[in-house]
Amino acid sequence: MIKLLKKIDIEFYLILFLLSGMFKNLLFSIYGNNIKIPLTIIFGILLILMIYIKDIYKLKRLKEEYKSFIFLLLFFVWSLFSISYSSSENYVWYKLLGLGTNFLAFFGVLIMKEISLKRFTIYFSYFTYFFSLIFFMINPNSISKNFIFHDYFNEIYIQGWYLVLGQFLIVNMLLIFSFSEKKKIIYNLLISLNIICLLGGRFPIVLALLVFFIISIYLIQKKYLNKKLLMQFFKSLTIIILINSVLNLSSKTYRSLLLRSVYRFEVLSSSFNDLNFLNDQENYQESLNQENNSFNKRLEYLLFSKTKIFENKSSLILGYGLGSFSNEYDQTDRRLYPHNIIVEMVFELGLIGLLLALAFLISNSSSYKGFFTNLALLAALTLLINSMKSSSIVDLRLLFALLAISIFHFNKLTLQN
């Protein structure tokens, strides 16, 4: 058994750990939330064990590179200290454990002798496409509320996947440039962009289009584009369009996904007034109201945070303590956050917590050389941007792993491929 496990790439175990939350949500949707399997902890322990068993650790890097993570450790120590004045009694410990998994992702990558970004990307792509397929099959956010597999899956546990998968696919759009085959890069780039549009996350769609535009400009400036490459791109694009056309004609689920992507932008624009193309006005209006409520709720969280943060000097400098947001907001002790990690850090850990986080990023600025060729760093940046709108600081395992790869394992992989 051990011999079999040793043959599996360490990047596979790392991906299992980083995406453990997705596996957990999928299990909940099948068996309900009564199932008590701590997948993140199990996969985290498995990752560390395989690093040891495969003998691919380099512990002396902890001593050699301590300046790269000293502020990250101080951030964790400050988070621990803030528990002493946090109003949360129960959730705070879950949040502390979540922070711990972020640091495990960072230090797990740090102590590895080497990591292949290409193998990492292959496994990451496979799993991301797999979860996207599951999401499309179940279609948990269907406007018609007609859930095909309702007898087998409880769709409520994966309704938020459209945002998470959107973030992951943007990461994939950048990491695939670690491949050497141009055809594979183009197809994966277009497939990722296509899936993001079908998922319907507004911000991921906008950011994905921006990333695609920047990649195009970069390739043009560096004169990497040639006639052969353009022919391959348009050939691949034609195939993707044909597949989408067939699905649009033959699949009701596909049309439902496409429709949802269109109407979600109505929340941000008043120009979408012609709704005659919709067959189910009542369900559409109900879904639209839910989208408006979601948008308004996030705005309410931000305004509430602003008021509380500047309430006094103590709240600004020290914050209200780790895991305290829900207690301060509605006197409940549960998972709740303002959907912006900077606001979340200042609210719970004060300016001290924010400055420690910034110090960690700034202290590694020398490792960010070759910015446009450091694919892991670019991918981490997109996750950081996304986290300003829809993440909590305990949900950033992938971000921390990519930062560690960009700092300790950057080997000048370029977009020239």
Residue positions per predicted region:
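A juxtamembrane structural motif centered on a specific transmembrane helix
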Residues: 1-10, 182-183, 367-372, 403-417
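N-terminal signal-anchor transmembrane segment
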Residues: 1-54, 77-86, 139, 383
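Transmembrane alpha-helices of multi-pass inner-membrane enzymes
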Residues: 45-48, 376-386, 393-417
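Aromatic-anchored transmembrane helix interface
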Residues: 67-76, 88-112, 123, 130, ...
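Alpha-helical transmembrane segments of multi-pass inner-membrane proteins
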Residues: 118-146, 157-222, 245, 381
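Hydrophobic transmembrane alpha-helices and their immediate junctions
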Residues: 126, 218-229, 348-384
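A membrane-periplasm/extracellular boundary helix in multi-pass inner-membrane enzymes
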Residues: 137-139, 198, 219-289, 307-311
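Long extracytoplasmic/lumenal interhelical loops at the membrane interface
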Residues: 287-349
